[in-house]
Each structure stands twice: as C-alpha cells, then as structure tokens.
C-alpha cells in the first residue's frame, strides 16, 4: 500500500458502503448477523448490526471523515459476525488507498469492488465502496491579505531596475546608412585581409555631431567589423543596378535634346517672320525633306489641309441649308390692311338664318372667302312641296297615332 503522506489541502472524505457478496457463513444453524467497522488513522466508525443478513448483506452505510495533510491516506474496512453474548467473529478485512479518491473529481468520485481476506490470505468475499473527497478552500482574513500584499510590494521593490535602451555600448545606425556603407566596408576588409591586418569586433561607424552620416574609421586603425550587421555584407549587386539606371537616364536625356532641336527648327520653318528667325543666320537653313525623313512625317502642310477642310465644311453646310429650304412648303402671303379690315367687319356682322340666300352667295363683293370653306362639300337642297320625291303625311305608310276618346258630357 501507499506509505506517502497527503500534503494537499484538507477536506472531507465521504465513504459509502453499498453492499457485500459471497461472504462465508459462520453460523451453521441460522443466518449470521453482520456489522461493519471503518478506521482511518485514529478515527474509527462502526455501523449498526444487520440481523440475519447472511452471506450477501446490503449496508447502505454512509460515513464522513475529516482529512488533513498529517493523516496517512489509508483506510481499513473490517466485516464482523455479531454475537449477542460473545465477542464478534471477524469475517474478512481489506485496506483501501485513499489517494485515488482524493485525486478524483469531486463530482464523480471513485468507486470499485474490493476483495476481503481472512487469516492466511483466504478469500472472504467482495465489498462495493464509493469514495468522494471534497477539499476545503482556505479563507484568508484581512490581516493575512495585508501581509501578503506587503510581502509582494517589498519583493518588487528589492528587484533591480533594468537599464534604459539608450545606455548600450553601440551607437544607433539607420538601415539606409548601413546599405550605403556596407559595400565599402567589404572592399576595405578584403584589401586589409590580403595585407594581413588583424580583425576585432567593435563599432565601425562613428556618428558625427554635426550630421547623422556614418564615417568610417581612420585608415591607420585596424579594420573593425560590426558585430550586428555581419549578415548584410556582400551587397555588391546594388552598385551594378545603380550603374544601369544612370546609363538609361543619360540616353533618354540625349534623345530629348535631339527632339527639342527638331521642334525648334520646325517652328522656325512655320514662322519665318518671328524674332527668333531674325536672330539666326542664313546659314542655319534646314533641309525639309531630310527633316521629314528623320521625324517620320510625310508632309508638313498642316495649314493648307486645315484651310481645305474649313472650305469643304463651309460649302457642305451652305448646300445643306439650301436643300433644307427647298424641301419646305412655301409660306402664305402676308396679309394687308384692307384684308384685315374686311376680316374684322365680317366677324362683327350678326348671324343670319340658313334660308337667307346672301349667306350662300359667293358673288358679293364684301364677302371674304374662308380658306376652310373652299374645299367643303355643298349642302343638299331643303325639301319643298314642288319636289316629287317629297311624301306628305297623308300618303305615308307609317301607322298613325291613335285618336283620343271622345269626352263625355
């Protein structure tokens, strides 16, 4: 069994003995009375006697023990056969290690079957026991809390203050400055290595007080390699890229200068009367055909083409305007004063009946023909008695109205 002492927090151990089975029967003529006894260190608990329990007793016995770190985590379980007038007879016993129960979850616990033994390791049945350990949380008083806080403050005050970042043995060097000076350091280091000068770790760069540019050490001093920037050595490829960039810019500047000269000559050709042309000598005349071939232009008659385009546009617009006028119908003549007076007098005359012949007479000198009446159809003549097609009411075939009945006197 385990011999270690539990050094954890103190708590309460709950022991629940459920039942036992296959116990030997010590009474030959009757069923035996069974009792249970539990012991942890100096603490002993005994159950009530179960009368006539026999070989498969059911205990349902619960007991609690206060566990402290000084108590050995071991429990003894003993089962007895109780006799009224005599001392009880031991049926079986077992030892249970409590560390499994103490380390288990308090909500689940630890339960299993344990074997009982008699003297000489003889089998005496099994017993089912459930163990649950609930630790006690220590409660600190205010005085204890204050002591703990004071102790923590004193320990933090005794700690040394770390040095500031500025108090380093090497000066600060920016990355851009390091890129510019690293190739020079590499070249000087290779040259001095061939000469056999010694190397030592230190600060290669010294920041001047007037500016923030890094300056190499004196040529008389031994070469000093920087300890922190050794990985950035050997960047000679950056110099090659700079050379190519410079060559490209020089070529572009040359082409721009040639184009500027050609543009000036073209302006002189277009504006011969300008002040710039008067200042130049006659010997600076330009061959137009050669200039056109050099530039890649077929002709320089931009002004003539523009004039021709303007003339074509003007002719097209004028012809389009005339054709548009021909398609429109002719406008009516402008009315005169006499026509206006006649029209107003005709509007002021009163209305006449339809049977008056003067309304339909178009030969009157004062009548003004309305444009809408020229194309209107003629009205049919009114029916008269002389017309042969006219039928009187008497000769009509339609039924007549029924006469009213005679009045009674």
UniProtKB/Swiss-Prot annotation:
Domain C2: 1-114
Biased composition (Polar residues): 315-328, 384-399
Family annotation (InterPro entries): C2_dom, C2_domain_sf, C2_fungal_Inn1, Ingression_C2_domain
Residue stretches in coiled coil: none
SUPFAM superfamilies: C2 domain (Calcium/lipid-binding domain, CaLB) (SSF49562)
Compositionally biased spans, kind Acidic residues: 302-313
Summary of the function given for this chain in its UniProt record: Required for the ingression of the plasma membrane into the bud neck at the end of cytokinesis, leading to the separation of the mother and daughter cells. Stimulates the synthesis of the primary septum (PS) by CHS2.
Name of the protein: Ingression protein 1
Gene name of the record: INN1
């Amino acid at each position: 069994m385990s011999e270690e002492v539990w050094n954890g927090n103190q708590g309460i151990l709950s022991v629940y003995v459920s039942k036992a089975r296959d116990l030997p029967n010590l009474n030959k003529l009757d069923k035996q009375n069974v009792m249970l006894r539990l012991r942890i260190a100096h603490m002993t608990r005994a159950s009530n006697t179960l009368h006539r329990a026999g070989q498969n007793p059911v205990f349902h016995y619960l007991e609690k023990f206060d566990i402290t770190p000084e108590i050995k985590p071991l429990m003894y379980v003993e089962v007895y056969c109780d006799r009224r007038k005599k001392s009880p007879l031991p049926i079986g016993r077992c030892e249970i290690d409590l560390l499994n129960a103490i380390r288990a979850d308090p909500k689940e616990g630890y339960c299993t079957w344990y074997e009982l033994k008699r003297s000489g390791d003889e089998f005496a049945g099994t017993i089912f026991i459930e163990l649950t350990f609930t630790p006690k949380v220590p409660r600190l008083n205010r005085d204890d809390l204050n002591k703990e806080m004071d102790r923590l403050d004193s320990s933090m005050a005794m700690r040394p203050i770390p040095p500031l970042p500025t108090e380093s043995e090497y000066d600060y060097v920016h990355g851009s400055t390091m890129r510019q000076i690293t190739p020079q350091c590499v070249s000087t280091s290779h040259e001095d290595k061939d000469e056999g000068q010694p190397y030592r770790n230190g600060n290669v760069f010294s920041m001047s007080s007037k500016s923030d540019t890094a300056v190499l050490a004196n040529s008389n001093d031994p070469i000093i390699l920087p300890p922190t920037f050794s990985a950035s050595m050997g960047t000679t490829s950056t110099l090659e890229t700079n050379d190519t960039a410079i060559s490209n810019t020089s070529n572009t500047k040359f082409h721009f200068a040639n184009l500027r000269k050609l543009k000036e000559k073209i302006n002189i050709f277009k504006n011969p009367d300008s002040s710039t042309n008067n200042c130049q000598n006659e010997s600076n005349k330009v061959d137009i055909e050669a200039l056109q071939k050099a530039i890649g232009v077929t002709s320089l008659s931009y002004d003539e083409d523009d004039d021709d385009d303007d003339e074509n546009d003007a002719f097209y617009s004028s012809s389009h305007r005339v054709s548009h006028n021909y398609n429109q119908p002719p406008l009516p003549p402008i009315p005169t004063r006499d026509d206006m007076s006649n029209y107003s007098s005709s509007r002021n005359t009163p209305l006449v009946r339809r049977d008056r012949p003067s309304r339909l007479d178009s030969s009157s000198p004062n009548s003004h023909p309305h444009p809408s009446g020229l194309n209107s159809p003629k009205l049919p003549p009114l029916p008269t008695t002389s017309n042969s097609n006219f039928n009187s009411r008497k000769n009509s075939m339609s039924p007549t109205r029924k006469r009213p009945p005679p009045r009674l006197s």
